[in-house]
Amino acid sequence: MSKVRNSDIRSELRPSAQLLKLTYTAASETAFEKFDRQCIKKYRGKWKSRNTVAEEKAIVRSDGSILRILVVRCEDGEEENATGLLWLHDGGYAYGVPEQESLLVDMFCGDGSCVAVLPDYTKSIEAPYPAALEDCYSVL
């Protein structure tokens, strides 16, 4: 993985990037890969919610590969005209899985007024930008 120079970062994002560098001093590709494996082991396939259910589905990407997504609904069913929500899980596009967001998504979908779609997008450690963004857009 090549080193990201300050000039590679959009000027308005540079202050946040500097803060992240201080926060994640050990943010190497190896560290992100290790943390991603831990997230997958701990969360993948385990939707921990009191009010919602997650159904795993697959979307075929333009290159023929499969994009895993979760469709989250209220456990008791949803209203007929529920709001749609595209939820991108935490992890800075570098690590994590949709299932780690169950508590937060519960707040939006638990009463049946919202249905959320959570893509298990391509991580930046697997493919460079805009791979994750393209995955998320393809869900729409």
Regions found by a protein language model. Name each.
Residues 99-118, 134:
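Short amphipathic alpha-helix adjacent to the substrate-entry channel of hydrolases
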Residues 97-99, 128-129:
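Conserved catalytic-core motifs of eukaryotic protein kinase domains, centered on the activation segment
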Residues 91, 120-124:
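Short beta-to-alpha linker loops that shape the active-site pocket of alpha/beta-hydrolase fold enzymes
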Residues 81-91:
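Short beta-strand element of the alpha/beta-hydrolase
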Residues 1-74:
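A glycine/proline-hinged amphipathic helix-loop "lid/cap" segment
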Residues 127-140:
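Alpha/beta-hydrolase active-site loop
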